């Protein structure tokens, strides 16, 4: 069975003064998470310069492994964003 896991990150980019500033923060996070073989995309608040929503997807055959990978990605995002992570959720799509 194929298991798809989705991690959604709500980010407040408090130090951003422009869309360019926000995109630098989002791009750095996306690049770091993509190094782990995850699919990453900015999915909401595209025109807001102090908010972002990033979705991270993982696919596998074992739900436990997919959940573990997404929890590590969540921890890494929290570490990199240094307090700017407002909310996160993990869901499994079967």
For each feature predicted by the language model, list its residue ranges:
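Flexible hinge/switch segments at interdomain interfaces of large molecular machines
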Residues: 1-3, 47
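Short glycine-/aliphatic-rich beta-strand segments at the starts of folded cytosolic domains
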Residues: 3-15
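A generic structural motif
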Residues: 13-18, 60-62
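Short amphipathic alpha-helix segments
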Residues: 20-39
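RNA-interacting cores
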Residues: 29, 50, 81
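A short linear hydrophobic-aromatic micro-motif
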Residues: 37-44, 86-87
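Short, charge-patterned binding micro-sites
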Residues: 41-62
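C-terminal structural segments of small proteins and small subunits
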Residues: 58-94
């Amino acid at each position: 069975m194929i298991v798809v896991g989705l991690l959604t990150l709500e980010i407040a980019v408090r130090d951003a003064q422009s869309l360019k500033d926000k995109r630098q923060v989002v791009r750095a996070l996306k690049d770091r998470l993509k190094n782990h073989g995850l699919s990453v995309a900015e999915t909401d608040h595209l025109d807001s310069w102090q908010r972002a929503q990033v979705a991270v997807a993982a696919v596998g055959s074992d739900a436990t492994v997919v959940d573990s990978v997404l929890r590590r990605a969540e921890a890494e995002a929290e570490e990199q964003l240094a307090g700017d992570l407002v909310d996160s959720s993990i869901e499994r799509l079967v």
